Amino acid sequence: LSLTSFDKEFELNGLAAESWLQSDDGLTWTFNLRDDLKWSDGETLKASDYIFALQRAATTGYDFGWYWSFAGGLKNWGPVTDGSMDVDQLGIKAVDDKTIEVTTETVKPYLPSVVSLWYPVPEHAWKKHGDEYAANVETMVASGPFMLESWEKSTNKMVLVKNPNYNAP
């Protein structure tokens, strides 16, 4: 469940984020998450799940890294991804369970559209199953309107069902 999304008229709307504000200097954005966001396993979706996702992307050779450097302009993305700076110095933080703060290197007035491609990773599932958390039906956890019911890997057939814990727009 991304923070924002575009509707059929190409208007930007909140998805996981119910609101966002840009600081006076233009370098810091605060995103406020909707109440009662849940993973498909019933666990609460937290701001820290978004932070965990980008921290993993920054430290695991993520192929889409240029997006967060160029379009997103995240503070310290380059030094963190090249290993010369600790991932905790990346310009993202969970202020609390419902608040994400993003700091950029330069003013990015379009950042709310950039975060339409920022998806969380269920840190609780990853801690329990490692990278296998998304490798099979029994351990896969989703945040969107659907979840995996079955997966025939030999034929690449997946059956999706409604996620009963999905309550975003």
Task: Walk through the language-model features, giving the residues of each.
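Extracytoplasmic
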Residues: 15-17, 24-28, 87, 95-99, ...
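Extracytoplasmic/secreted envelope proteins and their assembly/folding machinery
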Residues: 17, 47, 51-55, 89, ...
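Structural recognition of the beta-strand scaffold that forms the well-ordered cores
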Residues: 29-32, 159-161
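Short basic (Lys/Arg) and small-residue
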Residues: 37
